[in-house]
Every structure is written in C-alpha cells, then in structure tokens.
Amino acid sequence: MEENTKKAQQQTENVIGKENKIVTGVIWQQLLLFFFPILFGTFFQQLYNAADAVIVGRFVGKEALSAVGGGTGTLIQLLVGFFVGLSSGATVIISQYYGAKRAEMVGYAVHTSIAFSLVAGVGMMIVGITAAPWALRAMSTPEDILGPSTIYIRIYFLGVIGNLIYNMGAGILRAVGDSKRPLYFLIVSCLTNIVLDIAFVIGLHMGVAGAALATILSQALSAVLVLWVLMRTKDMHRLELRKIRFDGRMFHRIIRIGLPAGLQSVMYTSSNILIQSSVNALGTDTVAAWTAYSKIDSLFWMIVNAFGISITTFVGQNYGAGKMDRVHKGVRTCMGITAGATVLLSVILYNYASICYQLFTTDAQVVVIGEQILHFLVPTYFTYIAIEILSGTLRGIGDSWLPMIICCLGICALRVVWILTAVPLKNDILTIVFSYPLTWTVTSIAFIVYYLFFSRLKIVGSKR
C-alpha cells in the first residue's frame, strides 16, 4: 500500500507540472481538438462493418449483405452496446479523478475497468454463440439469410473480447485527454480488416465467415495496441498486469454511473429489434436497403457521437476542477458546432443518395427503396442533436439515471407504441422509420427542459 501511495504521489506531481488544456484552453478549440481524433476513430471503427458490407454485397450477393448487417448488427449492438454503456462509467470516473489530480484513485479505476472487460468478454462470448439462432428467428429473419447470419454472429462473438478491451482502453485514454492514439490504432486495425476481407472473401471465397473472421482478428490487433500504450505510459493511468483485479468500491462507482447508459443502450437496441423485425417482414430487398442505409446513416452517428464523447470528457474534467462556467459555455459551444456539422452532412447525403447506395449494391430495386428511406430520414437528423449533447453533458457530472429514464420513455417506449399501433394500419417502410424523428423530437424537448430547469448541473451552477 505504501509503495502504491508513493507511485501515486509521483504520478500526481508529474501531472501537476503539465498544463491541462481541457480545463484552461479556448473552449471551441479544445472541443474540436478532442472531436476530430474521436470522429476519425469512430469512422475507422465503422469501416469494420462497412468493409464487410461493401465486399460481401458486391462480391457475394444481397443475401450476404443482409446477413452481415440487419439483424446481426442489431444483436451485436444489443450486447456490445450494453458493455460500452457500462464502460462509460469508467470514463467519467477517470476523467473526474484525473481532473482533480487523484492518481491513486485513477489507478484503481483503470485496473478495475480492464478486469471488467475480461470478465464481460467471456460472458458475452458464451451468450452470443449459444443464443444466436434463437434470437435471429425471434426477429423474423428471412429463411434465405438465417444460415449465413448465424455463422457471422457466432464467429463475431467468438472474438468479441478484443472489441471490449479496445473500447475500454480507448475510453481510459480519452478520459485523460488522449484521443489521438486510439485513432492511430483504429486506422491500423481497419486497414488490416480491409486487407483480410479481400483475402478471405474474394481470395479464399469464405463468404460471410471470412468477413466475420477478418473483423475479429482486426479488433484483436486494436486491443493489443491499446493495452501496450497503457502499460508503457508514465502517467497516473498506467496499467500493470499484476494489478488487474476488481476493487469493490471502485467497481460500484463505475457501475452506478455506467449502468444507466448500458440500460439505455439495451432499450435503444431492443426497440430497434422491433423495428428490424418489421423491416424483415417486408422481404429481402427491403432488408438489404435498410442494411445499406444503416452504414450510410453511420456517418451522422459518427459525428454526433464524437461530439457526445467530447463533451462528456470536457465536462467531466472541468467539473472535477470546479470550473462550472466553462461547463456551461462548453455545452453551448458544442451544441452550435454539432448543429452546423449536421446541416452540412444532411445536404450532402440528401443530394447524393443514389451514389451512396450504389457503393453497396447494383440491385436496382434495393437502390430505389434505399433512396426513399434516405430522403425521408436525413432532413430530420437535427432533431436528435440535443439528446446526444445534453446526455453526454449530464453523464460528465455523474447525473445519468434521470437522463436514462427520459430516453427510455421518450425514445424506446414511444417507438414501441408507434410500431405496434401505426404499422399494422399502414405496413410500409416509411411508416416504420417515421418512429425515429417522432421519438427524437419528443425526447429532445424533454432533455432541454430538464437541463435548463431541473438538472443537478443547473442547480450546482446556480449556486456558484
């Protein structure tokens, strides 16, 4: 214990000697400096699945395209998204302790987080492999893609532990203000994934199995790289293998903050499973169009999620440092920048919808359905901005339960009600996807009201 305390004191002294620009620099510059590495990192992370979709869609067929997206993507997001939500608790805790220069607590949080990743990875692997066929059938997956979908999802979960370790490790690095190295690792692993996709799918004719194998090998590489950096750093977030274990109190703190985000992710995905089931009932062409749309749509989510992660770390460190004025200014600045980026992206996607779809498939009917979806949803993207930025802000100060409830009621529950009541009256793709802008608008209004008048952040800010 004495040795740990001395190390923590030395690491704290090292950090005190460095200026933390997140709590002292120009706000919009710090947000953008943090945002761009996260954006590019998310872009390359999305390329894992996008590369699978493009290569199998172009060289195997629309059934294979449906198998690597659609229901499989939703099920993967259900489990992995729950873990990523839980791990956000570690990011918040570490950013607050790092901002307050409490080295020993940062160390406990880092080692507990990695231990959690290992245990969760084993559990998720077992659940994913055994439950895949049942879950896909429960989603009304068309029979012609049930077999390849099962193969893809089982191989993916066989190597899911690499994904979890990378996400946790990258979250630790971002919590201390390092968003560049996670980007570099993703670039390397993404390029590896593309090369392996070409080799396995085109060269060895392994189909969806080759695409899944390429993905898990590439994710394992990114996990190794992020662990290597954590083990070599001299800062207070240094990882030592012999210290990887659960600290009960720290784990409780991480889960207390992360569980709402994890449950929120599960509720999101559960409602999306219902939507996916409704889409599946419309046939393979619509499933393929929806799968391709989800890849195109990921451009928006990359941008808005990157800003959400940026504001969480910005708020967490400034809140830990007691700088409430910077917290509020940061929120306003982040909202404005996100709105501008969303409008620009929406204009581009709307005007080049056909070209976007032709990257994924040459099937004319799939392209027609896809354009219809894209033209309907893209103009409504702006209605989601407040949800991401304000929920990220509130997570940054540890206020996560009520935002989770707002999302579960405003997005998930309302979405389910819409699908169960409106879709039977008019069962087409536009009726199904209208559930998105409807729920985004309602939930954004609720978040704005909560943030301005009732949130703990507003109460704390008004007292200083």
Question: Where do the model's predicted regions map?
Answer:
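Interfacial/gating helices of multi-pass transporter permease domains
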Residues: 56-77, 143-148, 208-209, 250-257, ...
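Small-residue-rich hydrophobic transmembrane alpha-helices
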Residues: 65-126, 163-182, 289-353, 384-407, ...
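Short runs within selected transmembrane alpha-helices of multi-pass transporters and secretion channels
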Residues: 87, 155-174, 182-190, 211-226, ...
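Transmembrane helical elements of multi-pass membrane transporters/channels
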Residues: 33-52, 155, 166, 189, ...
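Helix-terminus/linker motif at the lipid-water interface of multi-pass membrane proteins
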Residues: 43, 47-66, 136-143, 199-206, ...
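Residue-level signal for short hydrophobic patches within transmembrane helices
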Residues: 24, 28-47, 51, 75-82, ...
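Alpha-helical transmembrane segments and their lipid-water interface positions
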Residues: 45, 49-56, 80-87, 91, ...
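Short alpha-helical transmembrane segments in multi-pass integral membrane proteins
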Residues: 1-35, 94-159, 203-259, 315-380, ...
